[in-house]
UniProtKB/Swiss-Prot annotation:
Its cofactor is Mg(2+). SUPFAM superfamilies: Obg GTP-binding protein C-terminal domain (SSF102741), Obg GTP-binding protein N-terminal domain (SSF82051), P-loop containing nucleoside triphosphate hydrolases (SSF52540). Its EC number is 3.6.5.-. The gene is obg. It is an enzyme of class 3 (hydrolase). One of its GO terms (molecular function) is GTP binding. This is GTPase Obg. GO terms for biological process: ribosome biogenesis. It comes from the Bacteria. An essential GTPase which binds GTP, GDP and possibly (p)ppGpp with moderate affinity, with high nucleotide exchange rates and a fairly low GTP hydrolysis rate. Plays a role in control of the cell cycle, stress response, ribosome biogenesis and in those bacteria that undergo differentiation, in morphogenesis control. InterPro entries: G_OBG, GTP-bd, GTP-bd_Obg/CgtA, GTP-bd_prot_GTP1/OBG_C_sf, GTP1-OBG_CS, GTP1_OBG_dom, GTP1_OBG_dom_sf, OBG_GTPase. Residues 337-422 form the OCT domain.
Length: 422
């Protein structure tokens, strides 16, 4: 079975906790704080692998978590960073945030990587909090939790040439004759329900990858037939070979079929309508093909190269393969492949925090304050006092008062709730 969609959960490693330790050594009076920092959590990284062809591995395992950072220790020993978790995906995989639909990465080249969940920062040890007013702090930060999210993975095959056309036009038979691909072939519509890849080798030593795309029908751009499931696989190809049932053996008109298929490609993605293509006038061994070939040449011969072929007998396939190979030499290798895309680092201007009231609870939002809260050891009185100073310094307390907070009201910051005391 061919799997070209998957949904997975990824979580970066949590940062290690900072350490509270005091230096106690002979001949070292007033040793002072000596607690080391926690290590950073590992990142979750997706890496494109040209040797993979489907997303089937994600059918059996959907949750991935990187290693957390080690905790800090005494003697100012910092914890080791967590190891990154590298997940291999097929080249051509598009990565999106499942919740927002945001495009995170488009991994199109072998070895290309994208960080999809960053590890949390390690907490600072008590040695970091020495001030002239507090020479012996007995508090440390907890490690920051790693990023977590659900991802939608979508594979768009990477092939040089795409075979397109109506069902039963002979695409699968053609690819089986010019390559070692062995797709299922039968005389009923939609025999091919998954894309097939084959390497076509030319006598002069050149080769290219050909993809047999399941048959398209009118309305495919709206999802009719196999529609959206496989139209996206055509997007990566550099050249299209339009396979037509020239004999009209299925009761269709090849001249009209060509128009319909090209219209569907353009409606799905306008760039596909401009993609270079040649016509493989197939089934020339059947009655009626010669007459329709003449009509095709009259209608499209001035704009497209037309090759009379028979995938069954092999007629004309050598000339088609040689010409396709020559055309690929003229088309840049990356012409249909987008520039490598990875989630950019965005610095958003705006307020450091927000304050609002919902159902009697005061909600404080903001990445900075939420990080301070989650990294504070709320069981440590000294750490809580530091958090209160941060809240006042950021202006959050003043904003809460302006919002009408009273003694005993509940304040929620991230996943934590506090009681406001004047």
């Amino acid at each position: 079975m061919f799997y070209d969609r998957a949904r997975i959960f990824v979580k970066g490693g949590d940062g290690g906790n900072g350490c509270v330790a005091m230096r106690r050594e002979k001949y070292v009076p007033e040793g002072g704080p000596w607690g080391g920092d926690g290590g950073r959590g590992g990142n979750v990284i997706l890496r494109a692998d040209g040797g993979l062809r489907t997303l089937v591995d994600f059918r059996y395992k959907r949750h991935y978590k990187a290693e957390r950072g080690r905790h800090g220790e005494g003697k100012n020993m910092h914890g080791a960073s967590g190891e990154d978790l590298v997940i291999r995906v097929p080249a051509g995989t598009v990565v999106k945030d499942a919740a927002t639909g945001e495009l995170i990465a488009d991994l199109v080249r072998d070895g290309q990587e994208a960080v999809v969940a960053r590890g949390g920062r390690g907490g600072r040890g008590n040695a970091r909090f020495v001030t002239p007013q507090n020479r012996a702090p007995r508090m440390a930060e907890k490690g920051e939790p790693g990023e977590e999210r659900w991802l939608d993975l979508e594979l768009k095959l990477l092939a040089d040439v795409g075979l397109v056309g109506f069902p039963n036009a002979g695409k699968s038979t053609l690819i089986s004759r010019v390559s070692a691909a062995r797709p299922k072939i039968a005389s009923y519509p939609f025999t091919t329900i998954t894309p097939n890849l084959g390497v076509v080798r030319v006598d002069d030593g050149r080769s290219f990858v050909m993809a047999d795309i399941p048959g398209l029908i009118e309305g495919a751009h709206k999802g009719a037939g196999l529609g959206h499931d496989f139209l996206r696989h055509v997007e990566r190809t550099r050249l299209l070979v339009h396979v037509l049932d020239t004999a009209g053996s299925e009761g269709r008109d090849p001249v009209q079929d060509f128009l319909v298929t090209n219209r569907e490609l353009s409606l799905y993605n306008p760039a596909l309508g401009r993609r270079p293509q040649v016509i493989a006038a197939n089934k020339m061994d059947l009655d009626g093909a010669a007459e329709n070939l003449a009509r095709l040449k009259e209608a499209y011969g001035g704009k497209y190269e037309i090759f009379p072929v028979s995938a069954v007998t092999g007629q004309g396939l050598e000339a088609l393969v040689y010409r396709v190979s020559a055309l690929l030499e003229e088309i840049p290798a990356g012409a249909a492949v987008p520039e490598a895309l990875e989630r950019p680092v965005i610095h958003q201007a705006g307020p450091r925090f927000t304050v609002c009231r919902e159902e009697g609870v005061f909600l404080v939002g903001g990445k900075e304050i939420e990080r301070h809260v989650v990294m504070t050891d709320l069981k440590n009185e000294e750490a809580v006092e530091r958090l209160q100073r941060i809240i006042r310094r950021m202006g959050i307390e003043e904003a809460l008062k302006e919002a009408g907070i009273k003694d005993g009201d509940t304040v929620r910051i991230g996943d934590y709730e506090f009681e406001y005391v004047e």
